[in-house]
A protein has these predicted regions:
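A conserved beta-strand-to-alpha-helix junction within the catalytic ATP-binding
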Residues: 21-39
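Short conserved segments within the C-terminal catalytic ATPase subdomain
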Residues: 41-52
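Acidic ATP/Mg2+-coordinating residue in the GHKL
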Residues: 107
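Short conserved segment of the HATPase_c
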Residues: 112-126
Length: 170
């Protein structure tokens, strides 16, 4: 079901027909709500979720709330898939870095090999470790994330250390 939804959504990306609805969003309340929503699922899985907001209360951005939620959910879903420690940890940090807001989602999972890092946002790309894993995804989730972020005028990148974890920044 999820694969079909992702493929359908990706076909909309290919034809530039993603239905965006841009509105002013209060950064503080929006990301707090997202973290609370995701936190319930993390708690039921025994994963510790940290939420750190370093943005002033009144900061607003123009964004599509639904599509940004898709971004957050896809990134966190990937983090959960590749957590390999007895105690999984995912941290969400929101920072004001001058002219824009930066979101960081960090996990303590298995990490991504340096050779794979440049390609993780490519359509259908899957790392060697995910190809051999029953938990491996379709390989389009992060390409969807990248397109949404770019359509919002932003950029996304990742840093990672094998055996330590991964950080997604956008």
């Amino acid at each position: 079901d999820r694969l079909i939804n992702e493929l359908t959504f990706y076909s909309k990306i290919d034809t530039n027909k993603i239905p965006y609805t841009f509105n002013k969003i209060n950064v503080n309340s929006y990301f707090r709500d997202c973290a609370e929503e995701v936190g319930l699922d993390m708690e039921s899985r025994g994963i510790e979720l940290g939420y750190f907001n370093y943005v002033n209360e009144d900061v607003e951005v123009i964004a599509d709330a639904e599509q940004m939620k898709r971004v957050i959910n896809n990134i966190i879903s990937n983090s959960v898939k590749y957590l390999d420690k007895p105690k999984g940890i995912i941290n969400i940090r929101i920072k004001d870095v001058g002219d824009f807001i930066q979101v960081e989602i960090e996990d303590n999972g298995r990490g991504i090999a340096t050779k794979d890092l440049p390609y993780i946002f490519d359509r259908f790309y899957r790392t060697d470790s995910s190809r051999n894993s029953s938990k491996g995804g379709s390989g389009i989730g992060l390409s969807i994330v990248k397109k949404i972020i770019e359509d919002h005028g932003g950029r996304i990148w990742a840093t990672s250390k094998e055996g330590i974890g991964t950080e997604m920044h956008f």
